[in-house]
Design a protein with these regions (language model features):
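N-terminal leader/linker segments that initiate helical-solenoid repeat arrays
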Residues: 20-68
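Conserved small/polar residues in nucleotide/adenosyl-binding loops
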Residues: 159-160
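"A position-specific structural signal for the A-helix of alpha-solenoid helical repeats
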Residues: 24, 58, 62-65, 103, ...
């Protein structure tokens, strides 16, 4: 799975068109899973380029992994919500970008994990719809299929 993330971040490095060396350094750190070290530089870039979906996507990914690695539950929730806020902004700017949609599904799923059962069920329909669209757009991306597998598993755990 880590190899996939490294390849994903290398993909970002190849297709990014802004901020030259700064962005290259950030992508190198992301590919090395150094999320704490990229948070501040990304936030600085975001303040310069608030409408850049590539920066927002990277901020979302960074906060998602900070959430996943958090020891404190409050840090987990705070970073999960930030990840979702950033990806929502990116989605508003570039709603047809399959990588943004993929991370939208991931961060949405994370934010509803502790929600009410009713909301989990309602959001599971949204998650499935978007995940299927991502699979259609990125049919060779194995991570998309993993997302669907996780969705089915988490849905099976919901107790009414």
């Amino acid at each position: 799975m880590i190899i996939f993330y490294k390849n994903l971040f290398k993909f970002f490095a190849l297709f990014s068109l802004i901020v030259g060396q700064e962005f290259k350094d950030i992508d190198t750190k992301l590919s090395n899973l150094e999320f704490e070290q990229v948070q501040l530089p990304l936030e600085q870039l975001h303040s310069k380029y608030p409408e850049n979906s590539d920066i927002l996507l990277r901020l979302s990914i960074t906060h998602h992994y900070l959430s996943e690695s958090a020891i404190e539950e409050s840090e987990d929730k705070k970073n999960a919500l930030k990840a979702f806020e950033y990806i929502e902004q990116a989605n508003d700017i570039d709603p047809d970008n399959p990588n943004i949609l993929k991370w939208y599904v991931i961060t949405l799923g994370k934010t509803v994990e502790e929600d009410t059962i009713r909301n989990q069920i309602e959001q599971s329909k949204n998650i499935q719809k978007i995940a299927l669209k991502v699979i259609e757009l990125l049919p060779n991306d194995e991570f998309c299929y993993s997302i669907m597998g996780q969705w089915h598993y988490k849905l099976s755990l919901i107790h009414i």
